[in-house]
Curated annotation (Swiss-Prot):
Main location: membrane
Species name: Yersinia pseudotuberculosis serotype I (strain IP32953)
Catalytic activity: fluoride(in) = fluoride(out)
Top-level taxon in the UniProt lineage: Bacteria
Pfam families in alphabetical order: CRCB (PF02537)
Keyword Membrane belongs to the record: yes
Descriptive protein name: Fluoride-specific ion channel FluC 2
A GO MF term: fluoride channel activity
Gene name of the record: fluC2
Family: Belongs to the fluoride channel Fluc/FEX (TC 1.A.43) family.
Membrane topology: Multi-pass membrane protein
Disulfide bond positions: none
UniProt xrefs under InterPro entries: FluC
Amino acid sequence: MTAIDVMWVGLGGGIGSLLRWWIGLSIGKVYKGNFPLGTFLINISGAFVIGYLSILFSVDWRDRYGDLMNAAVLTGILGGYTTFSSMQLDAAKLATARGRAIAAGYLIISVLVGLAAAAFGAWLAY
């Protein structure tokens, strides 16, 4: 790892985080429901893009952090864009406000749809 690698990951992470913030804010202005739609759509779209680009970039999953494009785009931008921690916070809020079953359903749906989106993105890239 070099200083330039750290710079690319940090720059990508900043870009991804800003995209997540802007998209989440935009969705929140339009959607006023109880479902955490912003986090859901951000994570699903991120899963799709990472599935697609991982094939396009020929990612070797045993050494997926070494290449500059992987570091800047997959780890940096998409790592900053997607948000596991916000999904967990949303689930905790759902559990308090609407019950544990709703929260568990949200987590299960998020994971399954995310896996399907990543697989679909990878399939499209082949």
